[in-house]
């Protein structure tokens, strides 16, 4: 299995892939044309918000099996095209739950103490 990481990710992602002996490439900042040219060389792709997987990019994918979205939404993935190509799309809706809770509590303290 070979994975493309197309957006910046935590170092923990690389640690997990290495521990599972999964081959991966990190190619961030690619243009849509560059991504379209390389995406079908991979079994999976890990993305965040910066990478947009449009129908044009996904249309000719015959090898891609899974799209992993680090984050809540999948609005940057053309789900109809992924479904047509039988590509599994997954996200991590609870991935930033703790950080969101910490920010919320911090903002409450800020409001209570009139800190701007």
Annotate each predicted stretch with a short phrase.
Residues 1-42:
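N-terminal glycine-/charge-rich "phosphate-binding" loop or analogous flexible N-terminal tail
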Residues 5, 44-116:
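Phosphate/diphosphate ligand-binding glycine-rich loop within oxidoreductases
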